[in-house]
Amino acid sequence: MRIAGVNLPLNKHAVIALTHVYGIGRASAESILQRAGIAPNRKISELNDEEAHAIREIIAEQYKVEGQARGEQQTAIKRLMDIGCYRGLRHRRSLPVRGQRTRTNARTRKGKRKTVAGKKKAVKK
């Protein structure tokens, strides 16, 4: 079953499968299924066409998913960088934005280690 251009895994419960769509988390998935009148523990393979259509309609009307959600997030980050605020500078330098320490750790954000040459030892005569 495809929703918002994403193939949902058929063997998973509906509430879990919906979280494979970017922009839909666990709480949103539960809310969507409740509005559609579908039990969260039903598998995607068990849903009929009317139920699938109801889910698609709810998502299309009330949620920003996939490309639209990603675009909004990128726009928000670009705005922070353009206005030159602290968070924008941290994004620009690829450093942690939320106040984490960077003397050690922060490897995910900073990338692979770049080795800096150490101090040369003095040669004894």
Curated annotation (Swiss-Prot):
The keyword Ion transport does not apply. GO terms for biological process: translation. The gene is rpsM. PROSITE patterns: RIBOSOMAL_S13_1, RIBOSOMAL_S13_2. Belongs to the universal ribosomal protein uS13 family. One of its GO terms (cellular component) is cytosol. It comes from the Bacteria. Transmembrane segments: none annotated. One of its GO terms (molecular function) is structural constituent of ribosome. SUPFAM superfamilies: S13-like H2TH domain (SSF46946). Located at the top of the head of the 30S subunit, it contacts several helices of the 16S rRNA. In the 70S ribosome it contacts the 23S rRNA (bridge B1a) and protein L5 of the 50S subunit (bridge B1b), connecting the 2 subunits; these bridges are implicated in subunit movement. Contacts the tRNAs in the A and P-sites. This is Small ribosomal subunit protein uS13. Residues 92-125 are annotated as: Disordered. Pfam families: Ribosomal_S13. Keywords: Ribonucleoprotein, Ribosomal protein, RNA-binding, rRNA-binding, tRNA-binding. Part of the 30S ribosomal subunit. Forms a loose heterodimer with protein S19. Forms two bridges to the 50S subunit in the 70S ribosome. It comes from Pelodictyon phaeoclathratiforme (strain DSM 5477 / BU-1). InterPro entries: Rbsml_uS13_C (IPR027437), Ribosomal_uS13 (IPR001892), Ribosomal_uS13-like_H2TH (IPR010979), Ribosomal_uS13_bac-type (IPR019980), Ribosomal_uS13_CS (IPR018269).
